Amino acid sequence: MTRSVWKGPFVDGYLLKKAEAAQSSGRKDVIKTWSRRSTIMPQFVGLTFGVHNGHKHVPVLISEDMVGMKLGEFAPTRFFPGHAADKKAKRK
């Protein structure tokens, strides 16, 4: 179920402050965040966020195509190593 239009997009307040500070100073540091639920805003374009995936911070460079999506969509939380190979086929 999507968010109501009248409510507007959700972004953590501290994340907006950090993004504005990074834009005004022109620094290209990674902005670490645990807020996977925050919506990507147009003023985030060009910034790099370190989005936490439960294990580490995954660097995500924001592009114009990402605006309106959530930060957590770009930092997968699950690792799938693949299915086990058939041992009989390996021997031959």
Swiss-Prot record:
SUPFAM superfamilies: Ribosomal protein S19. InterPro entries: Ribosomal_uS19, Ribosomal_uS19_bac-type, Ribosomal_uS19_CS, Ribosomal_uS19_SF. One of its GO terms (molecular function) is rRNA binding. Keywords: Ribonucleoprotein, Ribosomal protein, RNA-binding, rRNA-binding. It comes from the Bacteria. Transmembrane segments: none annotated. Protein S19 forms a complex with S13 that binds strongly to the 16S ribosomal RNA. Belongs to the universal ribosomal protein uS19 family. HAMAP family: Ribosomal_uS19. This is Small ribosomal subunit protein uS19.
